[in-house]
């Protein structure tokens, strides 16, 4: 891995990733046995298993804005899920100081049969907000999502764009020090995307830490100064974003338009 020198640290890391590895199985019918849970995690992979991430290490300090780049299937989303503690590593460790606002698989935590109102209270509550805090922010959440006419509509009847709007509006109101954003800015209309951009800029201005996974270089350059380049599950470059993108584009040149 290439690590570029950086300025001397001014604060303790908010994220420590040390020697992290995680295995998956290509054959979904395959299941790990109970015995596998206690097996040596460093053992050789079984047939059908592969390392989605292997021996990944880095630290992140408060206020850093990090773009994660790489081809599809190289471990970018898996890395964010590890930081969010949605999944656990097979090897190594992930330490996160404080909470995480996860804008990953953004509509996954919502309940189809509940109304928008109930989903706002449920999702925000699961992320640690009190009822009083949700009461105080409810109107601004709905106003941001621009769905006031659908507050008492079951979530399953919303369009896909509306679902993304309400999910972003809720998660972006969490007062967590770390923000994880995985391709969610690729959906929705142009005006709402710009609204999301401004909200992320507000969060960064508050000193939050950002992880952004995106194939849109313009988005990465807008928000991020540091880049992590993942390839075949390995962290092959950690340094300035411009150099991470240059390395990535050199290794995998864009295909010419047909």
Where are these regions (language model features)?
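Pre-NBD coupling/linker segments of ABC/ABC-like ATPases
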Residues: 1-52, 241-256
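Conserved ABC ATPase "signature" region
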Residues: 34-41, 121, 133-150, 167-169
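The feature captures the beta-strand-to-loop junction immediately N-terminal to the Walker
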Residues: 69-71
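H-loop/switch region of ABC-family ATPase nucleotide-binding domains
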Residues: 214-215
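Conserved catalytic segment of ABC-fold P-loop ATPases
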Residues: 222-229
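Conserved ABC ATPase "signature" C-loop
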Residues: 232-233, 248
